[in-house]
Amino acid sequence: MSEKRKSNKIIGIDLGTTNSCVSVMEGGQPKVIASSEGTRTTPSIVAFKGGETLVGIPAKRQAVTNPEKTLASTKRFIGRKFSEVESEIKTVPYKVAPNSKGDAVFDVEQKLYTPEEIGAQILMKMKETAEAYLGETVTEAVITVPAYFNDSQRASTKDAGRIAGLDVKRIIPEPTAAALAYGIDKEGDKKIAVFDLGGGTFDISILEIGDGVFEVLSTNGDTHLGGDDFDGVIINWMLDEFKKQEGIDLSKDNMALQRLKDAAEKAKIELSGVSSTEINQPFITIDANGPKHLALTLTRAQFEHLASSLIERTKQPCAQALKDAKLSASDIDDVLLVGGMSRMPAVQAVVKEIFGKEPNKGVNPDEVVAIGAAIQGGVLGGEVKDVLLLDVIPLSLGIETLGGVMTPLVERNTTIPTQKKQIFSTAADNQPAVTIVVLQGERPMAKDNKEIGRFDLTDIPPAPRGHPQIEVTFDIDANGILHVSAKDAASGREQKIRIEASSGLKEDEIQQMIRDAELHKEEDKQRKEASDVKNEADGMIFRAEKAVKDYHDKIPAELVKEIEEHIEKVRQAIKEDASTTAIKAASDELSTRMQKIGEAMQAQSASAAASSAANAQGGPNINSEDLKKHSFSTRPPAGGSASSTDNIEDADVEIVDKPE
């Protein structure tokens, strides 16, 4: 098979906590691409089963029976230390552990997987979905992240893209992507708010759009708030109710918890459209008295009460975003709802309360982010003209200075890309080196902010304290990823650092993961080929057995026996798990024998036709052997040609019975 040619398309991927989506520009319009399963979004789930890696719907289907090896909502762990994810760990059935660097990783049967590797598996699925649609190899992408993702989380997402074999041309915030999708065909100036409550995170962004310019004025959010937390309150309610009814605690039963997770998600979705829902989980557990069943009714009012504190948590970030944008709620022309949780009526009511107007429901909350990413891909690829995106950083960036103080160099909501410089000096006489501790956050003391990197500037010439001139430069690229340098003016010595993900993935680790991903891709391809060959062989057995049954009396007995022998050979090859080549060879042999059925049937049809013709002319009813005796032939003369009409001999015809 010839290799696919490389595509010049830059695809847009919404790498979501719960679901992911891929889109591409086609004929100047963004198009969401359906997966091989026919769905426009793919569950962001990766599972390991029987030596095989499952992604998306196949992974979700087996989650109940394989909870410890089914990794869902892994986006909540990307770019974060183990010490930062205590609340998230409580909500998942799989094992989260710290690696040697203190990063949050997943322990599946003593093998550690980083969140970047799992994210890469989902991105590969999105890449393959786009390739199947385009018929070309895709190498470039725009990937979205929550607006409130910090520098480490953004860098980790970009690393996941690299592991998946993608050149990530841009990382853009999800609300910004949604605004692009909404405003690409709008005329006039507008100020809009994008309220994005997804599976794992909450973002609010205020933008000004007009004449193709999309300027983010401010952004805020909560990376610990999302649909998973809403599922969690329903799960806890079910656990409490079941314990009251049966006296059994299901919280330590991972298989039961996975069933409750699925039931909670289903109930949550249903309650956006109905006032109450039935939750039935038969045989949820068993005790000495026999099997136990869970049967509960949850009303929308109950659910809203259970989730009230979560909904309340969306208010403060919205107020802060408006304040940072120097706007009031009445200045906002439109409010976009993004993310599956924005469908919840109580959430929509709070949005109306905050902004004083009905939110816009004209965009698909599940697809709008991927569409915006595809538009940005079109901008970068030159397919979309006259669009300028001005984004901002969500959190202030600075360094630790004397007394453990956080000194910001770049304030939050500064438009990017940007570069900021500031002169610092030493705190002691003849200080030979300084340690630059890079921080992200809004607190005045360094220890209360997130340390995202550190490096040393050494060999500073001896000088009294306060004399050395050390220029620190913060350079933030369009992806919101930070590069820091420090230079001593006297010696000219300079030290630079690209702030890497808190996961601490080094270049050699990323390259190894890329190689591993390619290896698994080849293994998965071989497994699929083997599965396809087995399925085809099974189909061949079925067709052969049906043909023998249907035509048993109409084909020679020796052919029936021959086919049955080859059916058994194929069945044995499948049973013994023979090589793909061996199964295919046995299947091909059976296929060849199957063709003989057709030949035998054709001969029989010809015989029947000849008999009918003879009968029509008043001739006798003769069998095929007799037909051979009654056949006639034409023979060209020696040296002549059968097509030569000048030398045609009379046919030799042997007449057995003269018709009356």
From Swiss-Prot:
One of its GO terms (molecular function) is ATP binding. Residues 599-660 are annotated as: Disordered. Residues 600-617 have a biased composition (Low complexity). Keywords: ATP-binding, Chaperone, Nucleotide-binding, Phosphoprotein, Stress response. Induction: By stress conditions e.g. heat shock. The keyword ATP-binding applies. InterPro entries: ATPase_NBD (IPR043129), Chaperone_DnaK (IPR012725), Heat_shock_70_CS (IPR018181), HSP70_C_sf (IPR029048), HSP70_peptide-bd_sf (IPR029047), Hsp_70_fam (IPR013126). The modification Phosphothreonine is found at T201. Pfam families: HSP70. HAMAP family: DnaK. PANTHER family: HEAT SHOCK PROTEIN 70KDA. Belongs to the heat shock protein 70 family. Acts as a chaperone. This is Chaperone protein DnaK. The gene is dnaK.
